[in-house]
């Protein structure tokens, strides 16, 4: 990352100048100064880059909302050179391209980008798991869900998607255990309580509470009232926020 390298260079230069000038506490203070200057430089450069890319993100968001999916993907791909400068930006761009491609039915492109999405891009990890599951690569699907849960432990939906896959494959006990893990994260969550009860009573999981966040994964056909929705790829923002608990 250029931002990190430049910040280190600025910090090292500051520390070296301090030491060579023989100022207070010479090299010891030079090291401290170098670290501090590097940190400040990193923050300032990162903020400058964020301000530079924000207008592009806003323009892309308008394209997504206007249904111009292919144009939005092209614009996101054009932003890839900027990932050399901004930490975490690459994973965010891959996540958004992957989600847009998956929602539009371009599974080849979706698979390529979803696999490279940042670990905290929960929706992208869920879409990647769903894609792998639909293609019969169930071990890879569970691996993607494991990553999503480790990186976003307080988000409930990954546990439910995992439980759905386990139950679908006939492993009801493992599905119950996965939702018990979710219950430990948030004991009052109604979705978890309902689905635990359904599993223990031999019923199918009810994923409707998750809305298009669930149906956008294309693991179940959405009811008629959801089909007019935009799907998960049209959601605002590039960094995923936890769902509101009911």
Predicted regions and their residues:
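Residue-level signal for cytosolic alpha-helical hairpin/rod architecture
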Residues: 53-57, 126, 176
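Helical anchoring/docking segments at protein termini
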Residues: 1-52, 223-246
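N-terminal topogenic membrane-targeting module
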Residues: 24-31, 37-108, 112-115
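Alpha-helical adaptor scaffolds
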Residues: 83-157, 161-164
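Alpha-helical linker/edge segments of TPR/alpha-solenoid repeat scaffolds
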Residues: 51, 68, 99-109, 136-144, ...
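Solenoid-like repeat scaffolds
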Residues: 43-48, 78-86, 114-121, 146-153, ...
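Terminal, low-structured helical/coil segments at or just beyond the last alpha-helical repeat
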Residues: 8-13, 182, 188-246
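Soluble C-terminal extramembrane regulatory/interaction domains of multi-pass membrane proteins
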Residues: 157-203
């Amino acid at each position: 990352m250029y931002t990190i390298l430049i910040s280190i260079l600025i910090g090292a230069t500051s520390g070296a100048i301090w030491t060579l000038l023989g100022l207070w506490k010479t090299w010891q203070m030079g090291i401290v100064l170098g670290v501090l200057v590097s940190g400040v430089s990193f923050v300032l450069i990162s903020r400058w880059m964020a301000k530079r890319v924000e207008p592009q993100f806003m323009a892309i968001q308008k394209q997504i909302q206007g249904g111009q999916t292919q144009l939005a993907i092209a614009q996101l791909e054009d932003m890839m050179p900027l990932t050399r400068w901004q930490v975490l930006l690459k994973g965010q761009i891959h996540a958004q391209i992957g989600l847009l491609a998956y929602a539009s039915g371009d599974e080849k492109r979706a698979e390529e980008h979803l696999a490279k999405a940042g670990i905290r891009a929960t929706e992208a990890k869920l879409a990647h798991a769903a894609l792998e599951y639909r293609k019969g690569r169930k071990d890879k699907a569970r691996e993607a869900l494991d990553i999503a849960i480790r990186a976003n432990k307080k988000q409930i939906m990954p546990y439910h998607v995992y439980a759905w896959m386990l139950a679908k494959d006939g492993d009801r006990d493992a599905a119950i255990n996965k939702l018990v893990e979710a219950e430990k994260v948030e004991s009052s969550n109604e979705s978890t309580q309902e689905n635990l009860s359904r599993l223990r009573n031999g019923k199918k999981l009810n994923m409707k509470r998750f809305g298009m966040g669930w149906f956008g994964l294309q693991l179940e056909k959405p009811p008629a009232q959801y089909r007019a929705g935009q799907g998960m790829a049209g959601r605002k923002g590039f960094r995923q926020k936890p769902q509101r608990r009911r």
